[in-house]
């Protein structure tokens, strides 16, 4: 009889390549790096600032805008070129932020509208008033100093009030002197009317005496003739 064949151990199951990949994925996951902050303002703001500072009558071209961005903000214009063109083609012109004076699309020239210029000019005085506010706050301090000086003035006023009665007494003395001077010339005028009065009284006395003596002398002979007529 032949010996029985030895039993063969079952082979271990081989892991599939798909499962191996799934196990490796958690190991490959790494925390994402935070995005670096921008070193320049938005593209729209940079383009508007470029057109504003260039102040070209016919408008600023795409090349002129790029040169300004490189000089002013030191950015990579090649990376920002698609964003600049996109802003110039659609957003800026459609929204009314820019006016296209020449060409079509991003290849033309662009200019700021008149309304945008007026708004920017109106905003400048607001900044000026904001800067002046701290100066206005400093003024009350000067007013406080003036109040102190005003408080000191009444002391000087009291001193002057004491001196005023002295001035009044001097004025009274000065007023008494002209009164005495006016009283002195009065006795000089008194003898003049005395000389005039006796002249007027002497004239009527001479005229009245002769008239009264002549009239009764003429009437006496008429009264003696009447008794002679009765005797006849």
From Swiss-Prot:
Subcellular location: Nucleus; Chromosome
InterPro entries, sorted: H1/H5, Histone_H1/H5_H15, WH-like_DNA-bd_sf, WH_DNA-bd_sf
Residue ranges, compositional bias (Basic residues): 149-171, 179-232
Family: Belongs to the histone H1/H5 family.
Chief localisation class: nucleus
Gene Ontology terms: biological process: nucleosome assembly
PROSITE patterns per UniProt: H15
Entry GO terms, CC: nucleosome; nucleus
Keywords for the protein's UniProt record, in alphabetical order: Chromosome, DNA-binding, Nucleus
Pfam families: Linker_histone
Positions in coiled-coil regions: none
Source organism superkingdom: Eukaryota
Stored SMART domains: H15
Sequence segments annotated as region (Disordered): 1-44, 103-232
Name used for this protein in its record: Histone H1-II
GO MF annotations in UniProt: DNA binding; structural constituent of chromatin
Species of provenance: Glyptotendipes barbipes (Midge)
CDD domains assigned to the protein according to its UniProt record, in alphabetical order: H15
Comp. bias (Low complexity): 1-18
Residue ranges occupied by any H15 domain in the UniProt entry: 39-114
